[in-house]
Amino acid sequence: LYEKNELTFAIVWIVVYCVLQSLANPLNQRIGIGYSASAAFCIVQTIILFAFLRKNKLEKRYGLCGSPVPARRFLYYVPLVILASGNLWNGVAFRYAWPETVCRIVCMLCVGFLEEMIFRGLLFTAIAKDNLKSAVIISSVTFGIGHIINLFNGSGMDWVNNLCQIVFAVAVGFLLVTIFYRGGSLLPCILVHSAINILSTFAEDTNLTAGMHLLHIGILIAVTVAYTLILTQTLPKHPWEASQR
């Protein structure tokens, strides 16, 4: 399937990933340990996808390698550390029993790899060959689409905060795809994605008011947008950009 159509291959992975995660939710409840089935499904998918990439020697094509661009050109990735630490700005809390905590960490670690490889690796690369702008937009927006569900799931946040969450997710999507296609490595994207997800497990948000949350998200959006603009202006352009002008 991959050799016939890379885009179809990417879409199949997206569908399988979403279906398995949906099926995992009721299984987590039956097992009685949060994220247990989710972690198991993610581990299996991670192993299969990584083995496929290794077998077909596609690691470099999809960014599982170091970047040829020096770290100083990325400001030593300090803004990514700031973004990853955002969940801990209001303090640290241990809210779950240790079995669920372990399952959450394992699941989120794998989710970082899977979502970056599927959306910013497989999907972006398949589209970028023909239309770089479309690839950037689609890859970035899909990162924010999942947050729309917070508008309807009774998360407790008002619609303004939820919309800011979506804007932040889309902004992060643009940032990560810029790091990948300008820097040639998906590893920083995987690491920061996993870190943001994992640290959310230990976030202290019991006393976080809507106003504080809005300020929090606003700062993260500002850091993300500023960092993206700096990278787009200073990093070397990818050959795709020159060939599609």
Question: For the regions a protein language model found, what residue spans apply to each?
Answer:
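N-terminal membrane topogenic signal
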Residues: 1-13, 70-72, 185
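Central hydrophobic cores of alpha-helical transmembrane segments
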Residues: 13, 135-144, 187-200
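Functionally important transmembrane alpha-helices
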Residues: 22, 161-218
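Juxtamembrane helix-loop-helix connectors linking adjacent transmembrane helices
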Residues: 29-38, 53-117, 124, 128-129, ...
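Membrane-interface capping segments at transmembrane-helix boundaries
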Residues: 54-61, 229-245
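Hydrophobic alpha-helical transmembrane segments in multi-pass integral membrane proteins
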Residues: 84-89, 142-154, 199-213
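Membrane-interface helix/loop boundary segments of multi-pass membrane proteins
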Residues: 114-140, 181-185
